[in-house]
Curated annotation (Swiss-Prot):
Single GO MF annotation: RNA binding
Protein name: Maturase K
Protein source organism: Berzelia lanuginosa
InterPro entries documented for this protein: Domain_X (IPR024937), Maturase_MatK (IPR002866), Maturase_MatK_N (IPR024942)
Family note: Belongs to the intron maturase 2 family. MatK subfamily.
Keywords: Chloroplast, mRNA processing, Plastid, RNA-binding, tRNA processing
C-alpha cells in the first residue's frame, strides 16, 4: 500500500498553469486558425481575416462578462449582436483560441513522457491505421470482446471539474463555463445524437479536447489499477492521462479497498487483455470466459456510476465472440476468422492427413454501408446505380474529373488495409460512371459518347491503384511493391476517418 500511496503523491510543481493571459495574445488565434501554417484536414477553418485582433478580444470578453449581454431571448439567440456581428461568431473565434491554450499543459506533459520512453516519431501514433497493427496480432489469440458505448457526462460542470486542478487560474475556468453554457452546440457533449461524431464542424477542436479529457479521466484510473495488478505494465499509455483531479478519486479507492486490495483486483489480472478507444466507443478484448466478460461488463457500469457520476446501464456494453462477430471499427469490418489448412504427414508406410485451422485477424471493406454513404452524397441511388452529380455541372471538365478522382484515390488509400480489395472496384466503377453521367449532363450528351471520348483518361484517373503509388515510392523494388499491394497496408499519415467510411 505504501507503494500505491507514493504513486498517488501530488506533484505540486505541475499545478501552477496560469493560462488566462494567453487569451489576449494574438498569435494564439493565428495558431487556432492555422494562419500561415499548413492547414489540418480535421481542423479546417474558414480563415483568419484579421478578426482576432487584441483590441477586439479584450472588448469582447469585457462585454461577455456584463450581465445584460448574457441574457438572450429565445427569439434572437442566434442574432444577438456584438459590435454589429453575430454573437456565435465571436464565441467560436475565442473558444478556438481557448482550446489551443488549454492544450498547452497537456502537450508539454505528453512530450516529456514520450521523450522519457524514447518515442521519437510520436506523430505516427496519431494515425488511425496505427490501431489495426495493435489489434492484428493479439486478437488472433483472444476469444471475446466487450463493445462499449462510452457514457457522456450528465452535467457540463463535470467537464469544468475535470480541468479544475490542472488549470489553476480561476479566470480561465470561468471563461470555460461561459463558453459551455452559452454555446448551443455544447449540449452535444451531454446528449449526443451520434457517439463521438456529433460535434459542430465550426468548433471541433474545442469540443474534441473537452470530450477526450472527460474520457481520459476514467481511463487513467482504469489503467493505473490494471498496472498495479500485473507484472506486464502498460507501455502505450502516456502520462498525458494522469490528471491531478484523478488522484483524489484514486486515493479514495485505495482507502476503501486497503484491507482487501488484492482480493478486489483479481479481475485485472488477466494477462491477455487489450483495450482500444475510438469514436465514442471502446473495445476490451480478453481470452477469458463468458463469466469473466460478464464481470467486466458490470464492473464498467458500476465504475462509471459510483466514481465518476456517469449514468450508464448494462445495455450499453455488448459481449461478442470474436469467432462469429465482426466489429465495426473505423470504416472496417474487423473479425477473427479461421484459416483452414491441410497437412499430410508420412510415418513409415502410413500417411495421415491433419486438418489444422489457424485464427487470423481480418479487416474488410463494408461495401453496403459504403454504397449508402455514396447514395447520401448523391453519387448513386440506394441500390448502387450511378447518377449524375448535379451540383458540379457548373465546374470545368478537368475540375469535375479531378474531384471524382481525388475521392476515388482517397477511398483506396484509406481502405488499403482491407484483405479483400476487389470490393473497392465496385466503388471505383460507381464513381467513374457517375463522373461520366455528370459530364454528359453538363454537355447535354450521352454517357456512351463521353466514355468513348475520354475513356483512357477516365481509366487513368480512377484506377491509379496503391500498387502504382508504391512503385513510385520504391522504384527499385517494384516486384515487392506488387506483393505488398496484395496484402494489407497500414499507413501512418491518416489522422481522420474518411467521410464516406464514417458510417456512425
Amino acid at each position: 500500500m505504501e507503494e500505491f500511496q507514493r504513486y498517488l503523491e501530488l506533484d505540486r510543481s505541475q499545478q501552477h498553469y496560469f493560462l488566462y493571459p494567453l487569451i489576449f495574445q494574438e498569435y494564439i488565434y493565428a495558431l487556432a486558425h492555422n494562419h500561415g501554417l499548413t492547414r489540418s484536414i480535421l481542423l479546417e477553418n474558414s480563415g483568419y481575416d484579421n478578426k482576432s485582433s487584441l483590441l477586439i478580444v479584450k472588448r469582447l470578453i469585457t462585454r461577455l462578462y456584463q450581465q445584460n449581454h448574457l441574457i438572450v431571448s429565445a427569439n434572437d439567440s442566434n442574432q444577438n449582436q456584438f459590435f454589429g456581428c453575430n454573437k456565435n461568431l465571436y464565441y467560436q473565434m475565442i473558444s478556438e483560441g481557448f482550446a489551443v491554450i488549454l492544450e498547452i499543459p497537456f502537450s508539454i506533459q505528453l512530450m516529456s513522457s514520450l521523450e522519457r520512453k524514447g518515442i521519437v516519431k510520436s506523430h505516427n501514433l496519431r494515425s488511425i491505421h496505427s490501431i489495426f497493427p495493435f489489434l492484428e496480432d493479439p486478437f488472433s489469440h483472444l476469444n471475446s470482446a466487450l463493445d462499449i458505448l462510452i457514457p457522456y457526462p450528465v452535467h457540463l460542470e463535470i467537464l469544468v471539474q475535470t480541468l479544475r486542478y490542472r488549470v489553476k487560474d480561476v479566470s480561465s475556468l470561468h471563461l470555460l463555463r461561459l463558453f459551455l453554457y452559452e454555446d448551443p452546440n455544447s449540449n452535444n457533449l451531454i446528449t449526443p445524437k451520434k457517439a463521438g461524431s456529433s460535434f459542430s464542424k465550426t468548433n471541433q477542436r474545442f469540443f474534441f479536447f473537452l470530450y477526450n479529457s472527460h474520457v481520459c479521466e476514467y481511463e487513467s484510473i482504469f489503467v493505473f489499477l490494471r498496472n498495479q495488478s500485473s507484472h506486464l505494465r502498460s507501455t502505450s499509455f502516456g502520462d498525458l492521462l494522469e490528471r491531478i483531479y484523478f488522484y483524489g478519486k484514486i486515493e479514495y479507492l485505495v482507502e476503501v479497498l486497503a484491507k482487501a486490495f488484492q482480493a478486489n483486483l483479481w479481475l485485472f489480472k488477466d494477462p491477455f487483455m487489450h483495450y482500444v478507444r475510438y469514436q465514442g466507443k471502446s473495445i476490451l478484448a480478453s481470452k477469458g470466459t463468458s463469466f469473466l466478460m460478464n464481470k467486466w461488463k458490470y464492473y464498467f457500469v458500476n465504475f462509471w456510476q459510483c466514481y465518476f457520476y456517469l449514468w450508464s446501464k448494462p445495455g450499453r456494453v455488448y459481449i461478442n465472440q470474436l469467432s462469429n462477430h465482426s466489429l465495426d471499427l473505423l470504416g472496417y469490418l474487423s473479425s477473427v476468422r479461421l484459416n483452414p489448412s491441410m497437412v499430410r504427414s508420412q510415418m513409415l508406410e502410413k500417411a495421415f492427413i491433419i486438418d489444422n485451422a489457424m485464427k487470423k485477424f481480418d479487416a474488410i471493406v463494408p461495401i453496403i454501408p459504403l454504397i449508402g454513404s455514396l447514395a447520401k452524397a448523391k453519387f448513386c441511388n440506394v441500390l448502387g446505380h450511378p447518377i449524375s452529380k448535379a451540383f458540379w455541372t457548373d465546374l470545368s471538365d478537368s475540375d469535375i474529373i479531378d474531384r471524382f478522382g481525388r475521392i476515388c484515390r482517397s477511398l483506396s488509400h484509406y481502405h488499403s488495409g482491407s484483405s479483400q480489395k476487389k470490393s473497392l472496384y465496385r466503388i471505383k466503377y460507381i464513381l467513374r460512371l457517375s463522373c461520366a453521367r455528370t459530364l454528359a449532363r453538363k454537355h447535354k450528351s450521352t454517357v456512351r459518347a463521353f466514355l468513348k471520348r475520354l475513356g483512357s483518361e477516365l481509366l487513368q484517373e480512377f484506377f491509379t491503384s496503391e500498387e502504382q503509388i508504391l512503385s513510385l515510392t520504391f522504384p527499385r523494388v517494384s516486384y515487392t511493391s506488387r506483393r505488398l499491394y496484395r496484402r494489407r497496408i497500414w499507413y501512418l499519415d491518416i489522422i481522420c476517418i474518411n467521410d464516406f467510411a464514417n458510417h456512425e
